[in-house]
Amino acid sequence: MEKRISVAPMMGQTDRHFRYMISLMAKDVRLYTPMIHAEAIVNSSNNFIKRENGYQKKVGIQIAGNDPNVVVRAATIIEEHNYNEINLNIGCPSERVQNCSVGVALMKQPLSLIHI
């Protein structure tokens, strides 16, 4: 079985500079952007999306969202920017994140999660 190292998405930590440094130390590592809300992707000029994957080939983006339509629109935008994976955050236990009904709060709504 192939071993892989994944660097979890961490707000304020896994920015493009950190990921670049890690990629110099470990060639076969999975890297992720910090979590970004799907609405921010849909309602922005995509600066975050462009900036966070400017020079890296193997980067996943982690999004948070609870509206299936918004998540699909965000995923469509992301596909245009050379990310190799879209990761839906359903595990963040932060109260701030849960207050937005995303992250681990989605686990309390399994039927909604199916639609996303």
What are these regions (language model features)?
Residues 39, 92-96:
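Feature marks short, surface-exposed loop/turn motifs that line or immediately flank catalytic pockets
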Residues 10-81:
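Glycine-rich, positively charged N-terminal anion/phosphate-binding segment
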Residues 1-5:
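Extreme N-terminal starter segment of soluble prokaryotic enzymes
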Residues 114-116:
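Conserved small/polar residues in nucleotide/adenosyl-binding loops
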